[in-house]
Amino acid sequence: MSLNAVNHRRVLHRMPELDDELPDTTAYVRKVLEPLGAEVFSPIKGGVCAYFDAGAEETVALRADMDALPVTECTGLFFASERPGRMHACGHDGHTAIELGLAEETARMIRAGEKLPRNVLFVFQPAEETTGGAGRICETGVFEKYRVTRIFGLHLWPNLPEGSVWSRPGPMMARSNEVTLKVTGRSVHVSRAAEGLDALRAGVDWMNAAYAWTEALPPDVLRTLQFGRMTAGTVRNAVAGSAEIQGTLRTYDEDAAEMIRSHLRTLAAETAERTGCGLEVSFRTGYPAVWN
């Protein structure tokens, strides 16, 4: 199984696709699954499922994500991405390859007459990095139809020793909130800076205040707030008339997330009053935290 999984991963790594636009990826997944004797179907755009009926009352589901990231690969690997601006940089090619190998092994066991304690539903999910393909699959009722009582997923983690698996009860992975601050000021030439409203400086002030406040929270409020992108202004010798800061907030529970979101809004209002700029902070909530 391991050799097949390695081969699957290298094929998939060469042809990364984004979001739920996965025609080549799903074609390859179906090509592997369809000869195995499973019921293969597409629950949503860009998704594939394979159901192995072992004659059991209950079904266990195994899930893998398939989409890549808008990143240019520079690894020099012989199986590197052949698509500029797209790369399997988060390991979803590995997740899909592992699940394909497990599907092949499940088919072998059934053909050999081995008794499985449960039926098996393999779920290949699109849009994990973007719009939430998992939720759309859940909404189709597929898990109720096939009597799924438990579902397992995994994520490759290079920091772990090779050959090891890590899990624990309780929180495993934090929930994500995308944070965006938009600042509106007034652009003037730097020789008349006093007549302008500096959107860049207002954005930086807000960001520094946000960092200072979250870093001072008690250690039992598990959180990460990090800003990774900032754009502002048009030229070096003019006060920036607009600015935008983008970041990520991660927490394990919704109460902590809402407390931090509320304070970031308060900081935006205070910064607007102090600077005269308009500040609008918005959030896009991602997946909930993983709890076992």
Functional labels for PLM-detected ranges:
Residues 47, 69-71, 77-87, 94, ...:
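Histidine/acidic-residue-rich, glycine-tolerant segments that coordinate divalent metal ions
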Residues 18, 124-127, 285-289:
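Conserved short loop/turn motifs at secondary-structure junctions
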Residues 2, 9, 13-16, 33-37, ...:
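Structural signal for hydrophobic packing residues in well-ordered secondary-structure cores
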Residues 1-88, 93, 97, 104-118:
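Acidic/His- and Gly-rich active-site-bordering loop/insert found
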Residues 4-8, 21-32, 58, 86, ...:
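General structural feature for long, well-ordered alpha-helical segments within catalytic domains
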Residues 201-292:
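Metal-dependent amide/peptide-bond hydrolase catalytic core
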